[in-house]
């Protein structure tokens, strides 16, 4: 903090401006042209130079080269598609699976209308929204973890047996 420019609060002109409600726009260095023409390009070019330097000095393979003749037994999607993949994998009727996926954003869109005390920011004063968030997070985690398991253990996560 010793490097940054601090305003002189003993300056009577600055005190008068602050008393009138004129704040940070009336003291310090202007953003144009100092920041936008000199500091920002240096930071951006420095970041690009660091990335290019690391890519040139330490090139690493992302993974094994693809072998088109050896496919895995089960192809999994990216991790953020695991809950959706699990719904489609476990629901026997594909139309029902698609309708379940469409019902999630539709249900989330109805939450503000179910709970008309929107003026509060405290989550404890919005019990419906908080409950929907917590249950939705738990279900998404459950489905996401289940998508990585075999189909017979996917719904129970292997924690208990269903006959």
Swiss-Prot record:
TM annotation in the entry: 36-56, 95-115, 131-151
Main subcellular location of this protein, as a coarse class: plastid
Localization terms from the record: Plastid, Chloroplast thylakoid membrane
Gene3D superfamilies associated with the record: plastocyanin oxidoreductase, Single helix bin
Keywords for this protein: Chloroplast, Electron transport, Membrane, Photosynthesis, Plastid, Thylakoid, Transmembrane, Transmembrane helix, Transport
Source taxon at top rank: Eukaryota
GO cellular component terms, semicolon-separated: chloroplast thylakoid membrane
PROSITE patterns xref list: CYTB_CTER
Similarity field: Belongs to the cytochrome b family. PetD subfamily.
Protein name (record): Cytochrome b6-f complex subunit 4
Organism expressing this protein natively: Drimys granadensis
Gene: petD
């Amino acid at each position: 903090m010793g490097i940054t420019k601090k305003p002189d609060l003993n300056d009577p002109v600055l005190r008068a401006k602050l008393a009138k409600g004129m704040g940070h726009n009336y003291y310090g260095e202007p953003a144009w042209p100092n920041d936008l023409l000199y500091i920002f390009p240096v930071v951006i070019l420095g970041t690009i130079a660091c990335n290019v330097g690391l890519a040139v000095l330490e090139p690493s393979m992302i993974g094994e080269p693809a072998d088109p003749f050896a496919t895995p037994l089960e192809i999994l999607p990216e991790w953020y598609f695991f809950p959706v993949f699990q719904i489609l994998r476990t629901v026997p009727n594909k139309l029902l699976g698609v309708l379940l996926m469409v019902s999630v954003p539709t249900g989330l869109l109805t939450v503000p209308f179910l709970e008309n005390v929107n003026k509060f920011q405290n989550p404890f004063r919005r019990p419906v929204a908080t409950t929907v968030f917590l249950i939705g997070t738990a279900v998404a985690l459950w489905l996401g973890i289940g998508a990585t398991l075999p189909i017979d253990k996917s719904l129970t996560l292997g924690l208990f047996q269903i006959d």
